[in-house]
Amino acid sequence: KQTVKISVELFDYHSHVMASMQHYVNPSDVLIRRIDKSAHPHLVLQQPADTAHCINIAFVAEGYTACQMGKFLDDSRRAMEAIFDHKPFTSLRDKFRIVAVESASDVDGTSEPSAGKWLDTVLGSHFDTFYSTRYLTTLRLKRLHDALACVPYDHIIVLVNTSRYGGG
């Protein structure tokens, strides 16, 4: 593995470079944490013909136990089809790569603080954000991005094992 140069350029509305920076990354740097590539298995649900020019969407399991991964995959497929049932996604379906990340929790469901229910799930999600009963979020973003470490993604959809509608 060789050192690589990362260049970032910021453009204005006229496509002129306003600012730029370069950074070199040595893969053997002691501050780069090695991860277990098999920590969270994933399944490609839809593969576009041109993977270099597609939008990568990752469905991430939250509150599904290892025994419930079949249910998670079914829920992911159902959510994927629901997205593609609507314009403009219907006609652009071949531009999307969809992956389901099987991040198993030890317990099923999600926390509901207003009901006194706190669960230790893989992403630590919970309802009642900002005291809104349907507002579901997680503060454990590092865990979320660690679960996605070996999966290319542009957009993240966390599927929570609950029948209650929520989002955040």
Where are these regions (language model features)?
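Extended acidic/polar, glycine-enriched regions
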Residues: 1-51
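A common structural microfeature
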Residues: 3-5, 54-57, 95
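Aromatic-enriched hydrophobic runs in primary sequence
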Residues: 6-13, 21-23, 72, 84, ...
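A broad, low-specificity signal for short, low-complexity segments enriched in glycine/proline
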Residues: 18-19, 60-62, 116-121
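Helix N-terminus capping/helix-initiation residues
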Residues: 26-27, 65, 134, 140
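Short, low-complexity, polar/charged sequence segments that are solvent-exposed and flexible
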Residues: 27-28, 76-79, 117-121
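Fold-level signature of zinc-dependent metallopeptidase catalytic domains
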Residues: 32-85, 100-112, 142-145, 150-151, ...
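Metzincin-family zinc-dependent endopeptidase catalytic domain
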Residues: 90-168
